[in-house]
Amino acid sequence: MLNRRDCGAAVEVAARRHLERAGLRWLASNVCFRGGELDLVMYDVMSVVFVEVRYRQQESHGSAAQSVDRRKRRKLVMAAQLFLQRHPFLAQVPCRFDVVEGAGRPLQLHWIRDAFRLDDC
């Protein structure tokens, strides 16, 4: 049985593979900044995609995607801004925020494109 950290890492790897099979290109994983972390940064047809990966064994407390609340969205936006400052060649490219939620065993992934917008934060 995997511990919480290993389980999260396995779900992130599965999410990355899922997105790559869908045609996205991987740019970075687990990018940490003070106050926030980006699970995956991908590139999709002229867009930088910041991906939050969430996992829930059971949905008794809501779906994994529902756990990306306003506070978490703000942290993701702040981390995305810092990422773009460090990679200025991407700063002029449109960006979006996606969520990949994993649930159950065996793992099932659900990709939510454009899961939230800046004005949702």
From Swiss-Prot:
Molecular-function annotations in GO: nucleic acid binding
Top-level taxon: Bacteria
InterPro entries: Restrct_endonuc-II-like, tRNA_endonuc-like_dom_sf, UPF0102_YraN-like
Pfam families recorded: UPF0102 (PF02021)
Entries under HAMAP family matching the protein: UPF0102 (MF_00048)
Protein family (similarity comment): Belongs to the UPF0102 family.
Protein name: UPF0102 protein PD_1586
Organism: Xylella fastidiosa (strain Temecula1 / ATCC 700964)
